[in-house]
């Protein structure tokens, strides 16, 4: 019976996590002025680097939350915090680089790499700072 309880807990956290990632990607792509999905479909490396780094920057703290959450509502709360942190990282990079979206649209790989790296760094720091 213990294995079934473990499988149920795994399934709950995994599928809730997948749903939170999908919701995050939807919200993030609606917040940014450029259309990441279309740019990536059009082989825009800068957009791919930025969006991939952002995805990792969200999934890392979400994974930390899955490991340490004491309940499903706790997991949701930390997932929400990770989402907000990624939006703040994007806003911060745009303060530093106001033409970020235009640079990404114009295939500026350095701008895309910087955005992706900033998002990844924000996610790693976010995961490290999660306390219970």
Swiss-Prot record:
Q: Where are the transmembrane segments?
A: 7-27, 47-67, 72-92, 110-130
Q: Which residues lie on this side of the membrane: Periplasmic?
A: 1-6, 68-71, 131-132
Q: Does the keyword Transmembrane apply?
A: yes
Q: Which InterPro entries match?
A: DUF350
What is the predominant subcellular site recorded for this chain? membrane
A cellular component term from Gene Ontology for this protein is: plasma membrane
Which parts of the sequence lie on the Cytoplasmic side of the lipid bilayer? 28-46, 93-109
Q: Which UniProt keywords apply?
A: Cell inner membrane, Cell membrane, Membrane, Transmembrane, Transmembrane helix
Compartments reported by the entry: Cell inner membrane
Q: Which domain of life is it from?
A: Bacteria
Mind telling me which Pfam families this protein's record contains? DUF350
**Topological type in the membrane:** Multi-pass membrane protein
Q: Which family does it belong to?
A: Belongs to the UPF0719 family.
Q: Which PANTHER family match?
A: UPF0719 INNER MEMBRANE PROTEIN YJFL (PTHR40043:SF1)
**Protein name, entry field:** UPF0719 inner membrane protein YjfL
């Amino acid at each position: 019976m213990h294995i079934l309880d473990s499988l149920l807990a795994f399934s709950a956290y995994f599928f809730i996590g997948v749903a939170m990632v999908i919701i995050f990607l939807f919200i993030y792509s609606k917040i940014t002025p450029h259309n990441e999905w279309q740019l990536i479909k059009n082989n825009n490396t800068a957009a791919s680097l930025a969006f991939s780094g952002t995805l990792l920057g969200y999934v890392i703290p979400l994974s930390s939350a899955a490991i340490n959450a004491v309940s499903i509502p706790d997991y949701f709360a930390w997932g929400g915090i990770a989402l907000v942190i990624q939006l703040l990282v994007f806003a911060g990079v745009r303060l530093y680089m106001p033409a970020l979206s235009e640079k990404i649209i114009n295939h500026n790989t350095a701008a895309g790499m910087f955005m992706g790296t900033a998002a990844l760094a924000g996610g790693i720091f976010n995961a490290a700072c999660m306390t219970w």
